Amino acid sequence: VHDPSDLAGVRLRVQQSPINVHLAEALGAIAVPLPFPQLAEALRAREIDAQENALANVAGLALWESQRYLIATRHALSAHVVLANAEILAALGSGAAIVRDALRDALAEQRSETERLENELRDELAQRMILIELDAAARDRFVAATRLVHDRVARALGDDAIARVLAASVAARPAPSPE
């Protein structure tokens, strides 16, 4: 899979979430919403052709036993959201800045550790599977193919909401690795 057109007709296991179904369908795949615990058996039984998961999930289920290829699309960011009550934060006075600074430091450390673990997993999985890394141009084609899903979400939540989510996603994304 190097282009969205390569997914035409592929039975792709996705999380049981409407947005994941819409994303798969926008790419031309046949979305198969399936509970995660059933994934490995569905691959072995050829009930699905492919799946999309984080590297930790691929490794955790030893999916190299039932699929040969690993396409590193880097299509999703699992973000951690930190919420705070504005009144309580304001009541901290100057302590609020300490909380914000500590949170910023903790998030930076978490991102760094996540990147380190992802790189380790990618290297380990490359020993067991054929790893294909998509270049920036290919990733851009996937983004373009799923633009209608962004538009659908924007209609449901409002343009401002989707713009804020996309801006936060860009801000949280680690710097691209050299290609």
Where on the chain are the PLM-derived regions?
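N-terminal secretory/targeting leader peptides
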Residues: V1-E179
